[in-house]
Amino acid sequence: MADLKASEGDLSDYYMRLKKIFSNETRLQSREASISKRSSRVHKNIISAKEAIERQERDFGKLQKVLLNRNQELERRFTLGEALAQQLEVTRQRNADMEAQLLRHTTEGRQRSNELMECMHSLKQATGTYINHEALPARLNGVSVVRADDGDIKLIPFSLDGNDADGLHTLWRSLHTRTDNNASKWRKLISDQEVAGASPVTPSGSERPKATSKHSNFMPTSIIEIDLTSPTNDAS
């Protein structure tokens, strides 16, 4: 009996050990499965992270390329802006110089016109000869006032082609050889001009009468030549 009981006790102990071993193995398998699942999730997460990183790197490369292109475009625009600013400054300076030159020419022209008008007025007063300026330079129309010693006034009208040298010479000679007071004043003005060495004011180009061989040694320096191209507001 005692041996039987001892044998039963050994079997029971052996059973408990086997049961414990199986239980431990089951727990280990369960842990391995859990660890495997976790490892699989971690591996998937790592793969997803790598793919996300690769996508971000591609996007970053694209953005970097776009940024580089925009920086280059900004540099080109900045360079163009500087060039345009320099060109604008040069244009402004040129316009300022042209305005100053135009103002100077306008002032000189106005001064010259005033001088010619004053000269014309003086010659008109001295010679008693008045010209219709609206007809110039095509025609030389006007009237010469001759005052005799007894006070009588005689009006001598004239109408000549602006390019008729013979007609202009004849008019000059008739005015120059007059004996009235106006003619003497005129000759005094001419002699004063010759003494002062002043050059006659003459029109340019085709407006100036050309001397012919008949009068090659005598070219009139008169109000006719002075005012062929100069406007005036004096009454004709």
UniProtKB/Swiss-Prot annotation:
Q: Which GO terms describe its biological process?
A: cell division; meiotic metaphase chromosome alignment; meiotic spindle organization; mitotic metaphase chromosome alignment
Disordered: region residues: 194-217
Domain of life of the source:
Eukaryota
Q: Which keywords has UniProt assigned to this entry? A: Cell cycle, Cell division, Centromere, Chromosome, Coiled coil, Kinetochore, Meiosis, Mitosis, Nucleus
- Which segments does the entry list as coiled coil? 44-106
Q: Which GO terms describe its cellular component?
A: Ndc80 complex; nucleus
- Assembly with partners or alone: Component of the Ndc80 complex, which is composed of Ndc80, Nuf2 and Spc25.
Tell me the protein family, please.
Answer: Belongs to the SPC25 family.
Role: Acts as a component of the essential kinetochore-associated Ndc80 complex, which is required for chromosome segregation and spindle checkpoint activity during meiosis and mitosis. Required for kinetochore integrity and the organization of stable microtubule binding sites in the outer plate of the kinetochore. Participates in SAC signaling that responds specifically to disruptions in spindle microtubule dynamics. The NDC80 complex synergistically enhances the affinity of the SKA1 complex for microtubules and may allow the NDC80 complex to track depolymerizing microtubules.
Q: List the protein's name.
A: Kinetochore protein Spc25
Q: Which organism is it from?
A: Drosophila persimilis
